[in-house]
């Protein structure tokens, strides 16, 4: 039996790791595999209201529960897979799998919070029988930052994306670019704003990442007043439509473990402008406009280049083709195969 420790659904209301484990659980259920999903008190958008959830009651606050070893239910459990760097109780005799998503906390440390995160991640990795990394870049980061992990069986299994579709009239667009996700420092959101100051007929649509901060509003109102909007939390269908009609996705992040918006945009027929760094280069396979030493002028130049119909069509077609390499079913199927490899089957 497989145990999926669903602690991530209590740590996130939404987010990429939640989606990952939601899709994995959905596939396991569809494949009629015997499993148990341990779910703690949560308000997660993906976990609630789905038939495959089995609740596990705890009296501990989630801030303590997240660091605790997990009691194992059932004598026939042979695979334990935590959604966020936890280990089972020491008496567990089966195989332990850990998925490593990124090393953002190590690359951009935030004091004691990042130190605690790294200790837990390191312990989970070194206590595992098999490691799944969501990109080759993440695997290389793991081997560099935790050298002892080199001896642990490791596979790269890429993330998938949702059911995004391109529209029939490829190449047509409305005069806006889209920025998706978190906007903290290394995401280079301010650079995106500065780039649009150089192009006075293009709007900026921001999706997710929480409301604008006071500093962001000040910069937006100074550099591109009246040319920005925040879509907030929207459905996948609404996001798909925003991608379809956008001139481009701007994704200037300096570091990613994968970069799901890149593939979402490509699958939707939306060209991608991104920093030539970390995993984005790996997953885009030359279908994105990748920028070395990214800056506002280079972003602005890339946006302008996509006004050329032939060049835009080329990038859209390359992106759609590249996106076919990534699906949640493929991710989940490869994960179950890796379970069997670690079992020795």
Model-identified regions with their sequence ranges:
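Carbohydrate transferase catalytic cores enriched for Leloir-type hexosyltransferases
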Residues: 1-345
